[in-house]
A protein has these predicted regions:
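Short, membrane-exposed interhelical loops at transmembrane-helix boundaries
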Residues: 116-118, 268-280, 341-359
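Alpha-helical transmembrane segments of multi-pass membrane proteins
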Residues: 18-38, 101-107, 173-183, 374
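Long, contiguous internal "core" modules enriched in hydrophobic/ aromatic residues
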Residues: 2-6, 12, 16-25, 78-80, ...
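TerminUS-proximal long segments
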Residues: 11, 314-390
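N-terminal regions that are enriched for targeting/export leaders
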Residues: 1-52
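Membrane helical hairpin/interfacial module
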Residues: 47-111, 128, 132
Length: 390
């Protein structure tokens, strides 16, 4: 089936060429970083996780979001998701590849990543994170390819694949739960020291992943004969809406706990993220615009996905709502959550983080690599659908 990815119109090749250009530029930037060291990034002693790890955190959620198609289809026999389940599995593959790439570029010596396997430490969350991420990637590769191959041959999927499909569901939950535990297990960081980090991560994941799938389904409908179906899209939007509202509720709970308890350490990070902190005549507020964007775009997205006209009768506004939801959650978890957790540091000092141009280009390149992989996988899936259904 791989040969199907080698056939496409000029726009398909222009798109891949566009992504490939940024991938090449990012590769050059990474070689510079590899030779010079992480001193080329904006990270420091006080901010040891920067743009790379914040993107990793967000993309783990995007990967986990695909389970919101797998679970209803395979467990609850919701047949409307039959045509788009493969989109969720392929999105998980591309997202997990990006996750692993962000971990690699965050390491000064990438070869040291093998130490996690060569010298396993089960008491460390990093060990379990490596285990579930690679396990979930393997499961999606196996299930997605076997099921698509069966569909291509117009035969039922082999029965032996279904246990792997069912196993992938708890794996999807675990990848973001373990990632959350990496943060909430650090007692020196009050912003992350919360029992609802894992539920909050899952809520945002179940909004972000399906949002991107809806956008992809709408685009595929316009550029090919692939149609996910109105019922499937509407049900996904319902899932997105409930998940986004749950995530917003959890954010409000964080504010209530911090400000009602009036514990300075709990308030500090939220003050920095949403209002800025002034200390010794200097105002630190470089993340405030991003968090304002998170709130404003999130409210607009929820409104667009709630109003019947924009949700069911106008695909442009439906797609716009999903795009805004995806960006809003990226601003929250892909920017604010990780970077805001380092302010203030355990010594009550403030060190702001500014990514370098080299760091930004590597980040863009990894995202482009993910979309490159996703484009090829979706191309194969769509061609299989077109060959079968015409």
């Amino acid at each position: 089936m791989l040969e199907k990815a080698l056939r496409g119109n000029k726009y398909y090749w222009m798109w891949l060429g566009f992504l490939g250009t940024f991938m090449a530029i990012g590769a050059i930037c990474y070689v510079r970083q590899y030779n010079y060291g992480l001193g080329m990034t904006g990270m420091s002693r006080d901010v040891s996780w920067g743009l790379y790890i914040s993107q990793f955190t967000y993309l783990v959620g995007v990967a986990a979001g695909g389970v919101m198609l797998v679970l209803p289809y395979y467990i609850h026999n919701y047949k409307e998701f039959g045509r788009i389940t493969i989109l969720g599995e392929f999105l998980a593959i591309a997202s997990l590849v990006m996750c692993l790439m962000f971990i690699i570029v965050d390491l000064g010596q990438p070869i040291r990543a093998f130490n996690v396997m060569l010298h396993p430490t089960p008491h460390s969350m990093l060990f379990w994170d490596m285990l579930v991420l690679n396990g979930y990637l393997f499961l999606n590769l196996l299930c997605g390819w076997v099921i698509l191959t069966a569909e291509h041959k117009e035969v039922p999927p082999p029965k032996w694949i279904y246990p792997f499909v069912y196993i992938s569901i708890p794996f999807a939950i675990s990848i973001h739960t373990v990632t959350a535990m990496l943060y909430c297990g650090l007692p020196g960081r009050h912003f992350w020291l919360s029992a609802i980090i894992a539920p909050r991560f899952l809520a945002s994941a179940f909004a972000a992943g399906p949002s991107l799938i809806v956008v992809a389904a709408l685009i595929l409908k316009r550029i090919s004969k692939f149609d996910a179906g109105k019922k499937a899209i509407d049900k996904m939007v319902t899932i997105i809406l409930y998940a986004a509202l749950t995530n917003a509720f959890f954010v409000c709970l964080e504010f209530f706990v911090a400000y009602y308890s009036n514990v300075p350490a709990h308030k500090a990070a939220l003050n920095y993220l949403f209002f800025g902190i002034t200390e010794h005549g200097v105002t630190y507020n470089n993340l405030v615009p991003f968090m304002y964007g998170f709130v404003i775009l999130g409210v607009i997205a929820i409104a667009l996905l709630s109003i019947p006209y924009t949700r069911k009768k106008n695909e442009f506004f439906l797609g716009l709502g999903c795009v805004l939801m995806f960006i809003s959650l990226w601003l929250d978890k892909g920017v604010g959550f990780v970077l805001g957790g380092f302010v203030p540091n355990p010594l009550e000092q403030i060190t702001e983080y500014y990514p370098t141009a080299n760091e930004i280009m590597i980040t863009i390149a990894v995202w482009c690599t993910g979309f490159f992989i996703l484009s090829i996988l979706y191309k194969i899936a769509v061609k299989v659908e077109e060959d079968i259904h015409g």
